A protein has these predicted regions:
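S4-like RNA-binding module at protein N-termini
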Residues: 54-85
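Residue-level signal for mature regions of secreted extracellular proteins and peptides
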Residues: 35, 40-43, 63, 102-105, ...
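C-terminal structural segment of proteins
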Residues: 53-54, 66-69, 92, 96-102, ...
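Short, contiguous acidic and Ser/Thr-rich linear segments
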Residues: 12-21
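The −1 position to Zn-ligating cysteines in a subset of zinc-ribbon hairpins
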Residues: 41, 46, 66-69, 81, ...
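A basic, amphipathic helix-loop patch mediating RNA/tRNA/ribosome contacts
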Residues: 21-52
């Protein structure tokens, strides 16, 4: 058992133990190491000022991704290499991204600038030029209050890539890989001031720790837990970081009859899922693309989104409607739980105290099914939904054969709408049917008013989303018949 976190920052080794392990990464960088280029504005993942690149073992290499360091804790970083804005210089000179930002006047007060620079460096590390659209897309997680985005996007368009030195060349992977591989064999246990951290080396050790300490807070991407720690006073006595459970990071496909099913590991990030489904399902790709920002999607996971159990989380409606299943592993082995049985009440899960989510089985839509996923929020990116819906119909010769309907944001938990489903089966697929289904849906839900929307607004959405669904899909249906 190890009693320290092994972490490299800008190529230098750090062995961290005691109090500092329980600190946000930004505190450690700024106050312990004097790396003040990484800024903190919101401390909740919304602005990108704290963006750093995090490299984790991937085969014989390190895979670097941009993340928000304000919502990562040092205990999550065992066996990783962190690159801050200070570590991106080219031989003590500005790198091509920084040069372009200067030339194009991409900074005024400069507070947001390191975050933009790190996010852009990570975008350009593949050595390929980007369109304005791609640059904007890569920067949805970075806010600037004074320069305006035009100059920043222009800088992105003018980066001189002939001068770009890839991260892997600047920081050769060999040394890290050897150190990480030997350290990953051991679990980490650190106790300080009544708090205990456990970083298990395998799932068995994770379940045993959780069985002994049922109140353990699991941290995977940390994009929910760290916000609760930074802003809502969460101070867990027992924390377990899943970062070293390497076997949970894969997505594989299998067949269930004609249907393709994805098996998504419990540590698979939202970005990895977005990339995987991009050729398989336009709807799923879209709903993953509007999820948070790149920094959130590179850290956050599907398992975390499910276990966080928010009624307005973006992925559960798709999982409910596609009849997904959760694979939970505990000390007595593995069992499957239907997604529709997973929430027992507000933030109450059907998991035993020793269990964690190790896999999600997600059936994909068949070519003869119409599936639409809706996220209604005040802006397209980096916003929490007011209302979500997932509608799946199989229509044969104009008649609805099967229906699976799920809404989020209309009750304490995400819910299927059995009355609407029953009504739809056997009906003609028409605007009239969809309008009637909307009315039934309205009567089947009981939303509350909160900052994201009033009760009346949500009731109106519950009803009208069906007409939208019809208008969006009927044309395709007619062509297919
Ligand atoms: C700026 C910002 C934007 C966001 N945007 C969106 C958005 O657009 N849509 C949306 O739905 N959410 C959004 N979120 C919320 C969050 O990013 C997601 O819920 C994310 O999927 C959480 O994943 P994670 O791995 O970071 O979870 P964590 O924070 O690590 O954990 C979340 C919960 O799941 C539990 N948990 C984690 N892993 C497991 C496991 N393997 N087994 C059992 N329990 C586990 C944890 O104990 C915790 O209760 C946003 C958050 C932020 C900060
Ligand atoms: S400080 Fe705003 S995202 Fe980290
Ligand atoms: S330059 Fe001031 S916030 Fe962006």
């Amino acid at each position: 058992m190890r009693d320290y976190i092994l972490l490299y920052i800008n190529g230098r080794e750090h062995r961290v133990s005691g109090e500092k392990v329980f600190a946000p990464v930004t505190d450690y960088l700024r106050y312990d190491l004097g790396l003040c280029g990484t800024k903190v504005v919101c401390a909740e993942g919304d602005c990108g000022a704290c963006t750093v690149m995090l490299g984790r073992l991937h085969g014989e290499d390190l895979d670097y991704k941009p993340i928000n360091s304000c919502i990562q804790y040092v205990f999550q970083l065992d066996c990783s290499h962190l690159i801050t804005v200070e570590g991106l210089k080219h031989n003590a000179q500005l790198n091509p991204v920084q040069e372009a930002m200067v030339e194009c006047h991409g900074a005024q007060c400069g507070y947001c600038t390191p975050g933009f620079v790190v996010a852009m460096c990570s975008m350009f590390d593949d050595g390929k030029p980007k369109t304005a659209c791609q640059i904007k897309d890569g920067l949805t997680g970075n806010l600037c209050r004074c320069t305006g985005y035009e100059a920043i996007v222009k800088a992105g368009l003018e980066v001189d890539l002939s001068q770009w030195e890839p991260i892997a060349k600047r920081y050769p992977a060999g040394g890290f890989v050897k150190a990480f591989k030997s350290h990953l064999k051991e679990s980490v246990s650190i106790t300080w001031d009544g708090k205990q951290l456990f970083v298990p080396a395998d799932v068995k050790a994770a379940c045993e720790f959780k069985a002994r300490n049922p109140e353990t807070v699991i941290v995977t991407g940390g994009t929910d837990v760290a916000v609760n720690m930074n802003k809502r006073g969460l101070v867990p006595d027992f924390v377990m970081a899943t970062s070293n459970l390497a076997g949970l990071s894969d997505i594989v496909t299998r067949k269930d009859g004609e249907r393709t099913v994805l098996e998504i590991g419990g540590r698979v990030t939202l970005k990895a899922l977005e990339d995987f489904v991009s050729d398989l399902s336009e709807e799923m790709k879209y709903v993953m693309w509007v999820f948070g920002s790149p920094q959130i999607r590179y850290a956050g996971t599907l398992a975390g989104n499910i276990a966080n159990a928010s009624p307005i989380a973006d992925t559960p409606p798709m999982l409910f409607t596609m009849d997904a299943e959760i694979e939970a592993t505990g000390v007595n082995g593995v069992r499957k739980i239907k997604m529709t049985d997973f929430y027992l009440g507000y933030k109450k899960l059907a998991l035993q105290s020793d269990e964690l989510i190790t896999k999600i089985h997600l059936p994909l839509p068949m070519s003869d099914e119409i599936v639409r996923l809706y996220k209604v929020s005040r802006r397209q990116h980096l916003d929490i939904s007011a209302f979500t819906a997932a509608i799946r119909l199989k229509v044969t010769r104009g008649k609805i054969e099967t229906a699976a309907i799920t809404y989020g944001g209309v009750a304490a938990v995400v819910m299927r709408l059995p009355k609407v489903e029953q009504f739809l089966v056997g009906k003609e697929f028409s605007l009239e049917t969809c309008r009637e289904a909307g009315k039934i849906a309205r009567s089947e839900v009981a939303p509350i008013s909160d900052v994201r929307g009033s009760r009346d607004y949500r009731l109106a959405l519950a009803e009208n989303i069906f007409s939208k669904f019809y208008h969006e899909t009927a044309e395709r249906e007619l062509v297919c018949q």
